[in-house]
């Protein structure tokens, strides 16, 4: 486990930057090249979004269940680091889960209970107070996690990664531990959720943890075009800083199941559907305009914030997911920037099982 106090974190950051700049004296020229390449990708996202089109790939569950997934779609998923997989569960079943969760919240008098850890963790990410419920083991959640359709979905996604090499298996793509997470139930008109853009799976760890250093070695060597974001090597060894609401387990993909109809404007998920943004985020602190002790949105025990101050180019590519229906699922790579719309302008509850 990484145990850093703020002073140690700052000292290590200063040393890290000095060593990097000494090793790569022409780094800023290389960074300009990276910026140009990312600008091209971001402009495509902007253009498609202005036309009402999404660059987040979509796939029907029954296609990969029957082995009928076009290689072009696979390429799009890996390039964007995200995908909407439709019809994983029947609509009526997802709607029944939603009703059972509403009943569960009332029967357990949820609103009178203390909900501490999440609020502290998201203290720099929220506009006000998240409407994400600290409920993990309801019947609906357990059924969704253990369903055969979910197992097939996760297996398909896991197999997009390089999970073994030279006889070493980094993880088993068809076998997972049960991962318990929360639920979202957001009422129409709500303006309090507003999770600003961020990445999970650590913040300062991405620069200072030895396993992450090996994971991102090509990026830190400024050979960004050689970096493989789907390599399972080393990433599973990364250790997270202790925090009340941080998942320290290795996750190939993060995701949720829709329990209600929701789309742009409905207070739902936003993504930057571009897997290459991780190189920009890791390299941005190395530029001379950043104070030596600053890692551009990274603080111990917090999610990695992506802000207008340091990442304005990337935020141009932040888009809402396409409309999804109950039973659809949405997935994104652990290095993909994501957030939640500030305002729910829709007419019905926006609800998901994480």
What are these regions (language model features)?
Residues 283, 334, 340, 353:
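Ligand-binding pocket scaffold of soluble enzyme catalytic domains
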Residues 1-79:
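Fe(II)/2-oxoglutarate
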């Amino acid at each position: 486990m990484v145990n850093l106090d703020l002073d140690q974190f700052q000292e290590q950051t200063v040393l890290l930057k000095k060593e990097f700049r000494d090793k790569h004296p022409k780094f800023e020229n290389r960074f300009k090249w990276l910026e140009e390449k990312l600008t091209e990708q971001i402009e495509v996202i902007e253009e498609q979004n202005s036309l009402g089109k999404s660059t987040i790939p979509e796939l029907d569950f029954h296609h990969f269940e029957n082995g009928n997934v076009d290689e072009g779609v696979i390429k799009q998923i890996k390039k964007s680091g995200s995908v909407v997989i439709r019809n994983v569960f029947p609509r009526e079943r997802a709607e029944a889960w939603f009703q059972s969760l509403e009943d569960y919240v009332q029967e357990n008098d949820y609103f009178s209970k203390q909900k501490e850890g999440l609020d502290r963790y998201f203290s720099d990410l929220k506009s006000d107070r998240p409407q994400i419920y600290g409920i993990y083991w309801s019947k609906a959640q357990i059924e969704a996690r253990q369903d055969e359709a979910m197992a097939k979905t996760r297996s398909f996604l896991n197999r997009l990664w390089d999970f073994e090499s030279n006889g070493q298996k980094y993880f088993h793509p068809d076998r997972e531990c049960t991962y318990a997470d929360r639920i979202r139930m957001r009422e129409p008109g709500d303006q309090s959720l507003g999770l600003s853009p961020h990445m999970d799976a650590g913040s300062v760890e991405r620069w200072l943890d030895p396993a992450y250093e090996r994971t991102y070695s090509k990026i830190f060597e400024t050979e960004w075009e050689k970096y493989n974001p789907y390599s399972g090597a080393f990433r599973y060894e990364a250790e997270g800083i202790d925090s009340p609401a941080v998942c320290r387990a290795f996750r190939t993909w993060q995701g949720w199941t829709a329990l209600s109809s929701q789309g742009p404007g409905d207070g739902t998920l936003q993504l930057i559907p571009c897997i290459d943004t991780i190189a920009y985020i890791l390299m941005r602190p190395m530029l001379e305009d950043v104070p030596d002790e600053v890692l551009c949105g990274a603080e111990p025990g917090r999610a990695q914030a992506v802000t207008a101050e340091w990442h304005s180019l990337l935020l141009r590519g932040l888009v809402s997911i396409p409309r999804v229906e109950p039973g659809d699922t949405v997935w994104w790579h652990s290095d993909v920037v994501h957030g939640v719309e500030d305002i729910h302008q829709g007419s019905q509850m926006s609800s998901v099982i994480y």
